[in-house]
Amino acid sequence: MREIEHIPPP
């Protein structure tokens, strides 16, 4: 589940 690394922080 490395997709979260592509999502910048809010």
Swiss-Prot record:
Q: Which domain of life is it from?
A: Eukaryota
Provide the Gene Ontology terms for cellular component. Answer: extracellular region
Q: Which PROSITE patterns match?
A: TUBULIN_B_AUTOREG
- Which keywords label this protein? Cell wall, Secreted
Principal subcellular localisation of the protein: secreted
Q: Where in the cell is it found?
A: Secreted, Cell wall
Is the keyword Secreted in the record? yes
Q: Please state what the protein is called.
A: 64 kDa cell wall protein
Q: Which organism is it from?
A: Arabidopsis thaliana
